[in-house]
Amino acid sequence: MGSSSLLSFSLCLLLLCHLSQAQFGSSQESPFQSPRRSVSSRNECRIERLNALEPTRTVRSEAGVTDYFDEDNEQFRCAGVSTIRRVIEPRGLLLPSMSNAPRLVYIVQGRGIVGLVMPGCPETFQSFQRSEREEGERHRWSRDEHQKVYQFQEGDVLAVPNGFAYWCYNNGENPVVAITVLDTSNDANQLDRSHRQFLLAGRQEQGRQRYGREGSIKENILRGFSTELLAAAFGVNMELARKLQCRDDTRGEIVRAENGLQVLRPSGMEEEEREEGRSINGFEETYCSMKIKQNIGDPRRADVFNPRGGRITTLNSEKLPILRFIQMSAERVVLYRNAMVSPHWNINAHSIMYCTGGRGRVEVADDRGETVFDGELRQGQLLIVPQNFAMLERAGSEGFQLVSIKTSDRAMVSTIVGKTSALRGMPVEVLMNSYRLSRDEARRVKLTRGDEVAIFTPRRESRAEA
């Protein structure tokens, strides 16, 4: 009897471990693989020329603007992603919706609050109305329960799995600017390779193409049900059911909350303390309490720092475990005037680079050794660099800041020159014979950059150091 109980317990524990690994990814997976990428995208990367991209379609709402990049562009088809930029005005509410693809959202500017509804998780936040103005209704609406609400600020990365309801609100004094990259080639998306947004509220015009026809109207999903059955499902009358369908709502997907949005949320200090005290071993951080954001704009979080060159901050699934679930990661690069990033390539991911400030010169080379991009990337522009394409970036006189969203949760980079680089790891005689160099020349190629890693100071400063 005792051995039977022990066997049952062991089987249950084994099943739990298996499900945990299936849900969030096994820690033993090779970092060189991107197992949740669609194979169909591999035939669409025969690109002869890359271009700096800007939005091609704009949709205006009551309290903001949504800009869409052309997902049919060959660069987006190669990477298997779709990209959106939103500007949310103060007191603007991005209405609840969900998408067919997982996404990463980078906050370029502003602050606010965001809600991500985890299916099946309890409403753990309870708020009570205490204002005298509402005291008369206290007994009718004394308490509201909802899932956790997060505060976000400039430099935050938000991870949103596909199919999860998501909303955000600008409670600051300045517009919120956010760039969103959706991985439409992720195996979690079992529809087509296009981004599909499913509105839970409101209705939205599809917008006007910068060079093309006007779009149609997108209704929310409740509009697709009959009013009668919808009323029965919610247990409300027909009039209220019609309001849920937003038949005459012309405000768009970003609406203005005239009286603000009063929801319960932890203070920034409380939220930070809670996150610092939480283990990330995959068992103690449960599905319902999973952390969905982290800041990569704070200089104190930099992984690479050069006091005269700049800094690089990476965010992967080791730091934010939910990224293992959506198979994406992010990188923030800040270059000072005339500084450079070492020539490098992405080993296991495509890179969607968005310039958040300044400007810089970028060069990209393909597998034939051809230059597929040689130009300037300015604030608000986007460049997609396919996997293994080599790139080189140099800041202009204003500096150069960019964020890269990558299609692997543990994206890896190989630098060509500098400390820990490909050439640094080769014997001098290999370099001599490969490039027909003298021994002295080979040593200079290998060692001139000294201990600089990934970010190089302007050349004249390097000479001064020497």
Swiss-Prot record:
Gene Ontology biological process: seed development; seed maturation
Tissue-specific expression: Endosperm of the seeds.
InterPro entries: 11S_seedstore_pln, Cupin_1, RmlC-like_jellyroll, RmlC_Cupin_sf, Seed_Storage-Functional
Keywords (A to Z) from UniProt: Disulfide bond, Seed storage protein, Signal, Storage protein
Disulphide-bonded residues: C45-C78, C121-C288
Domain Cupin type-1 span(s) in chain numbering: 50-242, 294-443
Subunit structure comment from the entry: Hexamer; each subunit is composed of an acidic and a basic chain derived from a single precursor and linked by a disulfide bond.
Similarity comment: family membership: Belongs to the 11S seed storage protein (globulins) family.
PANTHER family: 12S SEED STORAGE PROTEIN CRB, OS03G0336100 PROTEIN-RELATED
Function text: Seed storage protein.
Protein name in the entry: Cocosin 1
Organism: Cocos nucifera
Lineage of the organism: Eukaryota, Viridiplantae, Streptophyta, Embryophyta, Tracheophyta
Gene it is expressed from: COS-1
